[in-house]
UniProtKB/Swiss-Prot annotation:
Residues in the signal sequence: none
GO molecular function: bacteriochlorophyll binding; electron transporter, transferring electrons within the cyclic electron transport pathway of photosynthesis activity; metal ion binding
Membrane topology, as annotated: Single-pass type II membrane protein
Official protein name in the record: Light-harvesting protein B-870 alpha chain
Protein role: Antenna complexes are light-harvesting systems, which transfer the excitation energy to the reaction centers.
Source taxonomy: Bacteria, Pseudomonadati, Pseudomonadota, Alphaproteobacteria, Rhodobacterales
Gene source species: Rhodobacter capsulatus
InterPro entries per the UniProt record, alphabetical: Antenna_a/b, Antenna_alpha, Antenna_alpha_CS, Light-harvesting_complex
Binding site for a bacteriochlorophyll: 32
Biological processes annotated in GO: photosynthesis, light reaction
Principal location: membrane
Amino acid sequence: MSKFYKIWLVFDPRRVFVAQGVFLFLLAVLIHLILLSTPAFNWLTVATAKHGYVAAAQ
C-alpha cells in the first residue's frame, strides 16, 4: 500500500478526475430518471396530488 502513489505515473490525474466526475454525474441522472419512472418515488406526481394542483387545459 505504501507504493500506491505510483498509480499516478500510469494514469493522468486530470483525466481520471474528469472521467470520475462525468461518471458520477451520469450515474446521478440515471438514478433520478429511474426514480421518476416509478409511481411510488415520482416526487412530481406526489407533490401534485398532495397540494391538489390541476394540470393546465390544452
